[in-house]
């Protein structure tokens, strides 16, 4: 039997998703819990796979892992797993085909970036965002790896205005390393008048050697992954711990924001 988990996590608590010797990672935390419960024996025999290897500091509301169950499939429930996990929350489970790979079966991925309003020219940001939609060579907007094709398709680039901040939502079939964060910084630079639409077009066409640095990872969330025929099921009991933990983090963040806001006003 092969099962998949829909997971959320606080990326600031980990050194990224992928296992690294001596470091706390999302993948390592999940594998620790699964082996402790006897659900899997080890990574190799369980064919453990993840959908997205998010960087250090990047959070997720919808990432996916899959594995072959060695025993105790009855324990693969959000309420059981969440009791044994820290800073990771299982929001749903699904039985999947034996050849299911969460990365290769994904139809699209959606990232959200939360950006404090620094007096941006919203119109300039929106015009700049339109340039990224479609199929392009994103070499100027990614940390390139030798074996990766830099051509990718961005399905949409939405800018959502909220009170005091923006949400930049990017959906694509796949993303290069740091691609989402570098696109965000390009939009930020356009909004600040540091970068023009013409320069962005030249970079996408390979006519301009300038590279855009990545935005900070803490503002990025893997928001969604689309699959065909895979339905993740959860329940209120299963997500109770997630709600409690996220509210604690939300309360702490609001307290610190209020504190530093008053310090800033007092200067």
From Swiss-Prot:
It comes from the Archaea. Substrate binds at residue 111. It catalyses: uridine(38/39/40) in tRNA = pseudouridine(38/39/40) in tRNA. One of its GO terms (molecular function) is tRNA pseudouridine(38-40) synthase activity. One of its GO terms (biological process) is tRNA pseudouridine synthesis. Pfam families: PseudoU_synth_1. It is an enzyme of class 5 (isomerase). Its EC number is 5.4.99.12. The keyword Isomerase applies. Keywords: Isomerase, tRNA processing. The active site is at 55 (nucleophile). InterPro entries: PsdUridine_synth_cat_dom_sf, PsdUridine_synth_TruA, PsdUridine_synth_TruA_a/b_dom, PsdUridine_synth_TruA_C, TruA/RsuA/RluB/E/F_N. Belongs to the tRNA pseudouridine synthase TruA family. Formation of pseudouridine at positions 38, 39 and 40 in the anticodon stem and loop of transfer RNAs. NCBIfam families: hisT_truA (TIGR00071). This is tRNA pseudouridine synthase A. It comes from Thermococcus onnurineus (strain NA1). The gene is truA.
């Amino acid at each position: 039997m092969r099962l998949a988990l829909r997971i959320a996590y606080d990326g600031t608590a980990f050194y990224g998703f992928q296992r690294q010797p001596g470091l706390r990672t999302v993948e390592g935390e999940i594998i620790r819990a699964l082996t402790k419960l006897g659900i899997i024996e080890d990574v190799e025999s369980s064919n453990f796979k993840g959908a997205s290897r998010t960087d250090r500091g990047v959070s997720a509301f919808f990432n996916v892992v899959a594995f072959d169950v060695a025993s105790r499939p009855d324990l693969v429930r959000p309420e059981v797993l969440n009791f044994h996990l820290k800073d990771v929350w299982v929001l749903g489970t699904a039985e999947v085909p034996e050849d299911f790979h969460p990365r290769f079966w994904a139809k699209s991925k959606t990232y959200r970036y939360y950006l404090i309003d620094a007096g941006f020219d919203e119109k300039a940001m929106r015009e700049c965002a339109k340039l990224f939609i479609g199929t392009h060579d994103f070499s100027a907007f990614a940390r390139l790896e030798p074996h990766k094709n830099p051509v990718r398709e961005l399905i949409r680039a939405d800018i959502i205005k909220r009170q005091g901040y923006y949400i930049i939502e990017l959906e694509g079939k796949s993303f290069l390393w740091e691609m989402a964060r570098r696109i965000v910084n390009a939009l930020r630079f356009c909004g600040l008048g540091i970068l023009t639409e013409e320069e962005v077009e030249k970079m996408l066409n390979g006519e301009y050697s300038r590279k855009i640095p990545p935005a900070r990872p803490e503002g990025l969330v893997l928001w969604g992954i689309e699959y065909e025929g895979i339905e993740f099921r959860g329940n209120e009991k299963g997500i109770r711990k997630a709600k409690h933990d996220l509210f604690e983090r939300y309360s702490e963040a609001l307290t610190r924001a209020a504190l530093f806001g008053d310090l800033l006003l007092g200067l």
